[in-house]
Protein backbone atom coordinates (compact mmCIF):
# COMPACT_ATOMS: atom_id res chain seq x y z
CA UNK A 1 0.00 0.00 0.00
CA UNK A 2 1.04 3.61 -0.54
CA UNK A 3 1.93 5.16 2.77
CA UNK A 4 -0.09 8.35 3.46
CA UNK A 5 1.62 11.71 3.92
CA UNK A 6 0.84 14.75 6.06
CA UNK A 7 2.50 18.09 6.71
CA UNK A 8 3.13 20.83 9.28
CA UNK A 9 3.79 24.44 8.23
CA UNK A 10 6.10 25.87 10.89
CA UNK A 11 6.86 29.34 12.21
CA UNK A 12 9.49 30.29 14.80
CA UNK A 13 8.92 33.45 16.77
CA UNK A 14 6.16 34.36 14.34
CA UNK A 15 8.37 34.04 11.25
CA UNK A 16 7.43 31.34 8.71
CA UNK A 17 10.24 28.78 8.40
CA UNK A 18 8.91 26.12 6.05
CA UNK A 19 7.21 22.77 5.90
CA UNK A 20 7.83 19.37 7.48
CA UNK A 21 6.37 16.44 5.54
CA UNK A 22 5.69 13.12 7.26
CA UNK A 23 5.18 9.65 5.84
CA UNK A 24 2.98 7.48 8.08
CA UNK A 25 3.53 3.76 8.62
CA UNK A 26 -0.15 2.93 8.25
CA UNK A 27 0.72 -0.56 7.03
CA UNK A 28 2.43 -1.33 10.35
CA UNK A 29 0.49 0.73 12.93
CA UNK A 30 -2.80 1.70 11.25
CA UNK A 31 -4.60 2.96 14.35
CA UNK A 32 -1.72 5.17 15.51
CA UNK A 33 -1.13 6.52 12.00
CA UNK A 34 -4.85 7.26 11.57
CA UNK A 35 -4.87 9.25 14.81
CA UNK A 36 -2.06 11.48 13.54
CA UNK A 37 -3.60 11.88 10.09
CA UNK A 38 -6.99 12.90 11.51
CA UNK A 39 -5.35 15.41 13.87
CA UNK A 40 -3.53 16.91 10.88
CA UNK A 41 -6.78 17.03 8.92
CA UNK A 42 -8.62 18.70 11.80
CA UNK A 43 -12.13 17.46 10.97
CA UNK A 44 -12.73 15.07 13.87
CA UNK A 45 -14.69 17.39 16.12
CA UNK A 46 -13.79 18.99 19.44
CA UNK A 47 -11.69 17.83 22.38
CA UNK A 48 -13.67 16.18 25.19
CA UNK A 49 -11.49 17.77 27.85
CA UNK A 50 -11.95 21.24 26.32
CA UNK A 51 -15.07 21.37 24.14
CA UNK A 52 -14.09 24.69 22.58
CA UNK A 53 -10.76 23.31 21.28
CA UNK A 54 -10.69 21.43 17.93
CA UNK A 55 -8.99 18.05 17.65
CA UNK A 56 -6.20 19.47 15.51
CA UNK A 57 -2.49 20.14 15.62
CA UNK A 58 -3.08 23.54 14.00
CA UNK A 59 -2.01 26.32 16.38
CA UNK A 60 -0.12 23.99 18.71
CA UNK A 61 3.58 24.32 19.52
CA UNK A 62 6.73 22.25 19.94
CA UNK A 63 6.80 22.55 23.72
CA UNK A 64 9.87 20.40 24.40
CA UNK A 65 13.19 20.54 22.56
CA UNK A 66 16.26 18.57 23.64
CA UNK A 67 19.35 18.81 21.44
CA UNK A 68 20.79 15.48 20.32
CA UNK A 69 17.62 13.72 21.46
CA UNK A 70 14.20 14.78 20.19
CA UNK A 71 11.63 17.55 19.62
CA UNK A 72 8.12 17.05 21.05
CA UNK A 73 4.75 18.50 20.05
CA UNK A 74 1.03 17.79 20.09
CA UNK A 75 -0.39 19.31 23.27
CA UNK A 76 -3.10 21.42 21.63
CA UNK A 77 -5.12 21.84 24.84
CA UNK A 78 -2.55 23.00 27.42
CA UNK A 79 0.55 23.75 25.30
CA UNK A 80 2.91 22.52 28.02
CA UNK A 81 3.04 18.72 27.75
CA UNK A 82 0.24 18.03 30.24
CA UNK A 83 -2.61 17.87 27.73
CA UNK A 84 -3.66 16.74 24.30
CA UNK A 85 -6.19 14.14 23.25
CA UNK A 86 -6.52 11.41 20.64
CA UNK A 87 -9.39 11.01 18.19
CA UNK A 88 -10.37 7.86 20.12
CA UNK A 89 -10.74 9.62 23.46
CA UNK A 90 -8.18 10.91 25.92
CA UNK A 91 -5.84 7.90 25.61
CA UNK A 92 -5.43 4.74 23.54
CA UNK A 93 -3.32 1.60 23.75
CA UNK A 94 0.18 0.91 22.40
CA UNK A 95 -0.44 -0.68 19.01
CA UNK A 96 2.92 -2.44 18.63
CA UNK A 97 6.65 -1.82 18.95
CA UNK A 98 7.64 -3.39 15.65
CA UNK A 99 9.62 -0.42 14.34
CA UNK A 100 12.71 0.54 16.33
CA UNK A 101 14.13 3.97 17.15
CA UNK A 102 17.23 3.29 15.06
CA UNK A 103 17.71 6.60 13.22
CA UNK A 104 16.93 10.31 13.36
CA UNK A 105 13.75 11.85 11.92
CA UNK A 106 11.41 9.11 13.14
CA UNK A 107 7.93 10.02 14.36
CA UNK A 108 7.04 8.34 17.67
CA UNK A 109 4.27 8.63 20.24
CA UNK A 110 4.95 10.39 23.53
CA UNK A 111 3.29 8.84 26.57
CA UNK A 112 3.11 8.76 30.35
CA UNK A 113 3.56 5.00 30.56
CA UNK A 114 2.08 1.92 28.87
CA UNK A 115 -1.10 2.45 26.85
CA UNK A 116 -1.33 6.21 27.44
CA UNK A 117 -1.08 7.50 23.87
CA UNK A 118 -2.91 10.72 23.09
CA UNK A 119 -1.93 13.40 20.59
CA UNK A 120 1.59 14.17 21.75
CA UNK A 121 4.44 12.81 19.66
CA UNK A 122 8.10 13.51 19.01
CA UNK A 123 10.62 13.49 16.19
CA UNK A 124 13.93 11.79 16.96
CA UNK A 125 17.10 13.78 16.29
CA UNK A 126 19.42 10.79 16.78
CA UNK A 127 18.94 7.03 17.18
CA UNK A 128 17.22 6.47 20.55
CA UNK A 129 17.27 2.69 21.17
CA UNK A 130 16.46 3.13 24.87
CA UNK A 131 12.92 4.08 23.78
CA UNK A 132 12.34 0.76 21.98
CA UNK A 133 9.48 -1.21 23.48
CA UNK A 134 8.17 1.88 25.27
CA UNK A 135 7.08 4.25 22.50
CA UNK A 136 5.28 3.44 19.25
CA UNK A 137 7.10 4.55 16.09
CA UNK A 138 4.48 5.37 13.46
CA UNK A 139 6.17 7.46 10.75
CA UNK A 140 9.13 9.51 9.65
CA UNK A 141 10.09 12.91 8.27
CA UNK A 142 10.66 12.71 4.51
CA UNK A 143 10.99 16.44 3.84
CA UNK A 144 12.01 19.35 6.04
CA UNK A 145 14.87 17.65 7.86
CA UNK A 146 16.84 20.90 7.91
CA UNK A 147 13.85 22.53 9.61
CA UNK A 148 13.80 19.76 12.21
CA UNK A 149 17.46 20.50 12.93
CA UNK A 150 16.66 24.21 13.20
CA UNK A 151 13.98 23.45 15.79
CA UNK A 152 16.38 21.14 17.62
CA UNK A 153 18.89 23.99 17.92
CA UNK A 154 16.44 26.48 19.40
CA UNK A 155 17.54 28.13 22.63
CA UNK A 156 15.34 27.08 25.54
CA UNK A 157 14.07 28.96 28.58
CA UNK A 158 16.22 28.66 31.71
CA UNK A 159 15.60 25.43 33.56
CA UNK A 160 13.18 24.08 30.95
CA UNK A 161 13.15 22.41 27.53
CA UNK A 162 10.65 24.94 26.13
CA UNK A 163 11.97 27.05 23.23
CA UNK A 164 12.34 30.75 24.03
CA UNK A 165 10.57 31.58 20.77
CA UNK A 166 7.38 29.68 20.00
CA UNK A 167 7.82 26.96 17.40
CA UNK A 168 4.27 26.89 16.09
CA UNK A 169 2.29 24.65 13.75
CA UNK A 170 0.69 27.40 11.69
CA UNK A 171 -1.05 24.93 9.42
CA UNK A 172 -1.31 21.20 8.87
CA UNK A 173 -3.04 18.78 6.57
CA UNK A 174 -2.86 15.77 4.30
CA UNK A 175 -1.01 15.41 1.00
CA UNK A 176 -2.13 13.43 -2.07
CA UNK A 177 -0.94 9.83 -2.40
CA UNK A 178 1.17 10.72 -5.45
CA UNK A 179 3.06 13.52 -3.67
CA UNK A 180 6.80 13.28 -4.30
CA UNK A 181 9.54 15.00 -2.34
CA UNK A 182 11.36 17.52 -4.59
CA UNK A 183 14.86 16.37 -5.52
CA UNK A 184 16.39 19.53 -4.03
CA UNK A 185 14.23 19.57 -0.88
CA UNK A 186 17.13 18.93 1.51
CA UNK A 187 19.77 20.76 -0.50
CA UNK A 188 21.89 23.10 1.59
CA UNK A 189 21.86 26.69 0.31
CA UNK A 190 25.22 27.82 -1.05
CA UNK A 191 26.65 30.81 0.79
CA UNK A 192 28.35 33.77 -0.88
CA UNK A 193 31.73 32.04 -0.66
CA UNK A 194 30.61 28.85 -2.41
CA UNK A 195 30.14 26.72 0.70
CA UNK A 196 27.08 24.46 0.47
CA UNK A 197 27.81 22.21 3.45
CA UNK A 198 25.81 22.15 6.67
CA UNK A 199 27.52 23.09 9.94
CA UNK A 200 27.41 19.45 10.99
CA UNK A 201 28.26 16.43 8.83
CA UNK A 202 25.34 14.41 10.17
CA UNK A 203 22.91 17.06 8.92
CA UNK A 204 24.22 17.10 5.36
CA UNK A 205 22.48 15.00 2.71
CA UNK A 206 25.70 15.01 0.63
CA UNK A 207 27.65 13.26 3.38
CA UNK A 208 27.38 9.60 4.30
CA UNK A 209 29.39 9.00 7.47
CA UNK A 210 29.86 5.39 6.40
CA UNK A 211 31.62 6.55 3.22
CA UNK A 212 34.89 8.24 4.13
CA UNK A 213 35.27 9.74 0.65
CA UNK A 214 32.23 11.96 1.25
CA UNK A 215 33.71 13.15 4.55
CA UNK A 216 37.09 13.87 2.97
CA UNK A 217 35.41 15.75 0.14
CA UNK A 218 33.48 17.90 2.62
CA UNK A 219 36.62 18.80 4.57
CA UNK A 220 38.68 19.49 1.45
CA UNK A 221 35.97 21.64 -0.11
CA UNK A 222 35.42 23.85 2.93
CA UNK A 223 39.17 24.01 3.65
CA UNK A 224 39.85 25.18 0.08
CA UNK A 225 37.21 27.89 0.46
CA UNK A 226 38.92 29.01 3.66
CA UNK A 227 42.30 29.14 1.93
CA UNK A 228 40.88 31.17 -0.95
CA UNK A 229 39.40 33.66 1.52
CA UNK A 230 42.70 33.81 3.43
CA UNK A 231 44.58 34.67 0.23
CA UNK A 232 42.02 37.41 -0.40
CA UNK A 233 42.72 38.69 3.13
CA UNK A 234 39.22 37.85 4.38
CA UNK A 235 40.77 36.44 7.52
CA UNK A 236 37.66 36.16 9.68
CA UNK A 237 35.81 34.27 6.95
CA UNK A 238 38.81 32.00 6.47
CA UNK A 239 38.93 31.36 10.22
CA UNK A 240 35.24 30.44 10.27
CA UNK A 241 35.69 27.96 7.40
CA UNK A 242 38.75 26.36 9.00
CA UNK A 243 36.85 26.04 12.29
CA UNK A 244 34.01 24.40 10.39
CA UNK A 245 36.48 21.82 9.05
CA UNK A 246 37.75 21.27 12.58
CA UNK A 247 34.18 20.61 13.74
CA UNK A 248 33.77 18.06 10.95
CA UNK A 249 36.90 16.25 12.12
CA UNK A 250 35.82 16.23 15.76
CA UNK A 251 32.43 14.69 15.04
CA UNK A 252 33.80 11.96 12.77
CA UNK A 253 34.84 8.76 14.52
CA UNK A 254 35.69 6.11 11.90
CA UNK A 255 36.59 2.62 13.05
CA UNK A 256 37.41 0.73 9.87
CA UNK A 257 39.46 3.00 7.58
CA UNK A 258 42.24 1.70 5.38
CA UNK A 259 45.74 3.05 5.85
CA UNK A 260 45.49 5.63 3.06
CA UNK A 261 42.22 7.13 4.25
CA UNK A 262 43.33 7.16 7.87
CA UNK A 263 46.45 9.07 6.85
CA UNK A 264 44.30 11.69 5.08
CA UNK A 265 42.13 12.17 8.17
CA UNK A 266 45.16 12.34 10.49
CA UNK A 267 46.88 14.83 8.18
CA UNK A 268 43.77 17.03 8.35
CA UNK A 269 44.10 16.97 12.14
CA UNK A 270 47.41 18.78 11.68
CA UNK A 271 46.83 21.06 8.70
CA UNK A 272 43.40 22.31 9.76
CA UNK A 273 44.45 23.51 13.25
CA UNK A 274 47.58 25.09 11.77
CA UNK A 275 45.36 26.96 9.32
CA UNK A 276 43.09 28.01 12.18
CA UNK A 277 46.14 29.33 14.00
CA UNK A 278 47.42 31.50 11.17
CA UNK A 279 43.94 32.85 10.33
CA UNK A 280 43.30 33.52 14.02
CA UNK A 281 46.61 35.40 14.30
CA UNK A 282 45.52 37.63 11.44
CA UNK A 283 42.11 38.07 13.10
CA UNK A 284 43.73 38.80 16.49
CA UNK A 285 41.86 35.87 18.03
CA UNK A 286 44.78 34.76 20.16
CA UNK A 287 42.82 32.31 22.30
CA UNK A 288 41.91 30.33 19.17
CA UNK A 289 45.58 30.33 18.14
CA UNK A 290 46.63 28.79 21.43
CA UNK A 291 43.93 26.11 21.39
CA UNK A 292 44.60 25.11 17.78
CA UNK A 293 48.37 24.95 18.18
CA UNK A 294 48.08 22.87 21.33
CA UNK A 295 45.99 20.36 19.37
CA UNK A 296 48.72 20.09 16.73
CA UNK A 297 51.34 19.36 19.37
CA UNK A 298 49.29 16.39 20.57
CA UNK A 299 48.42 15.12 17.08
CA UNK A 300 49.91 11.75 16.13
CA UNK A 301 50.61 12.87 12.57
CA UNK A 302 52.48 16.05 13.53
CA UNK A 303 56.08 15.94 12.29
CA UNK A 304 58.94 18.22 13.36
CA UNK A 305 58.00 20.92 10.85
CA UNK A 306 54.37 20.96 12.00
CA UNK A 307 55.38 21.13 15.66
CA UNK A 308 57.74 24.01 14.90
CA UNK A 309 54.92 25.91 13.18
CA UNK A 310 52.56 25.24 16.08
CA UNK A 311 55.07 26.41 18.69
CA UNK A 312 55.98 29.46 16.61
CA UNK A 313 52.36 30.51 16.10
CA UNK A 314 51.44 29.87 19.72
CA UNK A 315 54.51 31.82 20.76
CA UNK A 316 53.34 34.77 18.66
CA UNK A 317 49.92 34.57 20.31
CA UNK A 318 51.52 34.72 23.76
CA UNK A 319 53.65 37.64 22.55
CA UNK A 320 50.54 39.57 21.51
CA UNK A 321 48.84 39.03 24.88
CA UNK A 322 52.04 40.23 26.59
CA UNK A 323 52.97 36.88 28.13
CA UNK A 324 56.62 37.06 27.13
CA UNK A 325 57.69 34.18 29.38
CA UNK A 326 55.35 31.72 27.67
CA UNK A 327 56.18 33.23 24.29
CA UNK A 328 59.90 32.65 24.79
CA UNK A 329 59.34 29.12 26.07
CA UNK A 330 57.40 28.20 22.92
CA UNK A 331 59.70 29.98 20.50
CA UNK A 332 62.83 28.46 21.99
CA UNK A 333 61.21 25.02 21.87
CA UNK A 334 60.37 25.68 18.21
CA UNK A 335 64.09 26.07 17.43
CA UNK A 336 64.68 22.48 18.56
CA UNK A 337 62.51 21.36 15.64
CA UNK A 338 63.63 24.05 13.15
CA UNK A 339 67.08 25.27 14.32
CA UNK A 340 67.82 27.69 11.46
CA UNK A 341 64.41 29.27 10.91
CA UNK A 342 64.81 33.04 10.43
CA UNK A 343 61.21 33.86 11.40
CA UNK A 344 61.53 32.02 14.70
CA UNK A 345 64.86 33.72 15.43
CA UNK A 346 63.33 37.15 14.75
CA UNK A 347 60.36 36.37 16.99
CA UNK A 348 62.73 35.39 19.81
CA UNK A 349 64.66 38.65 19.46
CA UNK A 350 61.44 40.68 19.38
CA UNK A 351 60.19 38.90 22.50
CA UNK A 352 63.45 39.47 24.37
CA UNK A 353 63.26 43.17 23.52
CA UNK A 354 59.65 43.34 24.63
CA UNK A 355 60.42 41.61 27.92
CA UNK A 356 63.30 44.01 28.53
CA UNK A 357 60.98 46.95 27.89
CA UNK A 358 58.42 45.49 30.29
CA UNK A 359 61.10 45.06 32.96
CA UNK A 360 62.29 48.65 32.56
CA UNK A 361 58.72 49.91 32.69
CA UNK A 362 58.11 47.98 35.92
CA UNK A 363 61.30 49.39 37.46
CA UNK A 364 60.23 52.95 36.65
CA UNK A 365 56.80 52.30 38.09
CA UNK A 366 58.27 50.90 41.29
CA UNK A 367 60.73 53.79 41.63
CA UNK A 368 57.83 56.26 41.46
CA UNK A 369 55.98 54.33 44.15
CA UNK A 370 58.90 54.14 46.56
CA UNK A 371 61.09 57.03 45.42
UniProtKB/Swiss-Prot annotation:
EC identifiers of the protein: 5.2.1.8
Annotated PPIase cyclophilin-type domain residues: 7-174
Membrane-spanning residues: none
Reaction equations catalysed: [protein]-peptidylproline (omega=180) = [protein]-peptidylproline (omega=0)
Chief subcellular location: cytoplasm
Keywords of the record: Cytoplasm, Isomerase, Repeat, Rotamase, TPR repeat
Gene Ontology molecular-function annotations: cyclosporin A binding; peptidyl-prolyl cis-trans isomerase activity; ribosome binding; unfolded protein binding
Entry similarity comment: Belongs to the cyclophilin-type PPIase family. PPIase D subfamily.
Annotated localization: Cytoplasm
Record-linked PANTHER family: PEPTIDYL-PROLYL CIS-TRANS ISOMERASE (PTHR11071), PEPTIDYL-PROLYL CIS-TRANS ISOMERASE D-RELATED (PTHR11071:SF561)
Protein name: Peptidyl-prolyl cis-trans isomerase D
Summary of the function given for this chain in its UniProt record: PPIases accelerate the folding of proteins. It catalyzes the cis-trans isomerization of proline imidic peptide bonds in oligopeptides.
PROSITE patterns: CSA_PPIASE_1, CSA_PPIASE_2, TPR, TPR_REGION
TPR repeats, residue ranges: 219-252, 270-303, 308-341
Gene3D superfamilies with a match to the protein in the record: Cyclophilin-like, Tetratricopeptide repeat domain
Any GO BP annotation: protein refolding
InterPro entries per UniProt: Cyclophilin-like_dom_sf, Cyclophilin-type_PPIase_CS, Cyclophilin-type_PPIase_dom, TPR-like_helical_dom_sf, TPR_rpt
Disulfide bonds: none
Top-rank lineage group of the source organism: Eukaryota
Amino acid sequence: MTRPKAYFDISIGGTPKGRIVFELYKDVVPKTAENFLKLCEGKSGMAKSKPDVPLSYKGSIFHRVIKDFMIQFGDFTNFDGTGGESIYGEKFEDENFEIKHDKPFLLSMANAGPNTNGSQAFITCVPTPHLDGKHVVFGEVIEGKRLVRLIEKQQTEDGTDKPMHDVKVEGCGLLPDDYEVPADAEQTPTDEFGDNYEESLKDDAKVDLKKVETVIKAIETVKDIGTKQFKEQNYEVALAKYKKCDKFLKEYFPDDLNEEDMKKINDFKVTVPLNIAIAALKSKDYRSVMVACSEVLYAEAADAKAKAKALYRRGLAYYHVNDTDMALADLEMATTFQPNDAAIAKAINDTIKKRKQETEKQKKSLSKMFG
